[in-house]
A protein has these predicted regions:
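Short loop segments at secondary-structure junctions
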Residues: 114-118, 128, 137-140, 146-147, ...
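DPxDG-like acidic metal-binding loop motif
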Residues: 83-142
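N-terminal subdomain of lithium-sensitive/metallo-dependent phosphomonoesterases centered on the IMPase/IPPase/PAP
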Residues: 1-94
């Protein structure tokens, strides 16, 4: 991460702050009542996409193009807008579409700004919960709830013996493989709520989150917020989280290493 870029440019956090507010207004004015659902998977399986996903992404792209017309954009629903710029935006218009479809409030809008492929600023906006998370710099992250801003930090004092751990396997790990990580499974206390669980690590409410099969738009917007709040995030085989996949986020390094060791049998 280029710390000079992070520290010298407040335009991006300001933009993300305003975007969060605009997205919440857009939802309540345009999308809260009617939407259509399609299944992306033909045949067996269920991967829903809604007209709201597409409307949100169009809105986010419009805002980015208006403010930063030369930047590249990568979105879950509409793909790539190519550019020669070193800056790119990664968009998940609705993270937790299944939650959105059934009326659960835990879905979010996720947006990151990347520099040369590395996430440097992130936003996780939760319109129904009336709050959003973002990083101001590489060392400072905030939650804004009911228009009140509060600096957030992971629980650095968390210990292995009393972990608060959430996990989402999403059917990605077979029962055969799950039998290899029974010590980890016995530590699970909470189900994952998509991006909200990562955000709760940043606030110190959870100590560990493990999620399978993350795409770049699922995790890139969370990486800068996790790092800025003092957390650790990587793949379970200790690669950079920007490569996505099976992602582990922890409140401190000792816990991270310990949980990685428990997940080692399924890391390859």
């Amino acid at each position: 991460m280029n710390k000079k870029i992070i520290s010298n440019n407040n335009a991006y956090p300001r933009f993300l702050n305003q975007l969060a507010k605009d997205l919440s207004k857009f939802y309540y004015y345009k999308l809260s009542k009617k939407f259509k659902v399609q299944n992306k998977i033909k045949g067996k399986g269920y991967d829903p996409v809604t007209t709201a996903d597409k409307a949100f992404e169009k809105f986010i792209r419009f805002k980015i193009n208006k403010k930063f017309p030369d930047h590249e954009i990568i979105g879950e629903e509409f793909g790539y807008k190519k550019s020669k710029s070193d800056y790119s935006w990664v968009i998940d218009p609705i993270d937790g579409t299944r939650s959105f479809v059934i009326g659960s409030p835990t879905w979010s809008n996720l947006i990151s700004l990347n520099y040369k492929g590395n996430p440097i600023y992130g936003l996780a906006n939760f319109p129904i919960l009336k709050k959003y998370y973002y990083n101001q710099s590489d060392k400072v992250a905030y939650v804004v709830e009911n228009n009140k801003r509060k600096k957030i930090s992971v629980n650095k004092k968390a210990k292995y013996k009393d972990l608060k751990l959430a996990a989402g396997l999403h059917g990605a790990i077979s029962l055969k493989k799950q039998k290899k990580i029974t010590k980890f499974l016995n530590l699970m206390q909470f189900p994952c709520s998509d991006a909200l669980s990562y955000a709760q690590v940043c606030e110190g409410k959870l100590d560990v989150v493990f999620q399978c099969s993350n795409k770049i738009w699922d995790i890139h917007p969370l990486i800068p917020i996790i790092n800025a709040s003092g957390g650790i995030v990587s793949t379970i085989d200790n690669r950079d989280a920007k490569f996505a996949g099976n992602i582990l986020a922890s409140s401190n390094k000792n816990i991270h290493i310990k949980i990685q060791s428990l997940l080692k049998p399924i890391a390859k």
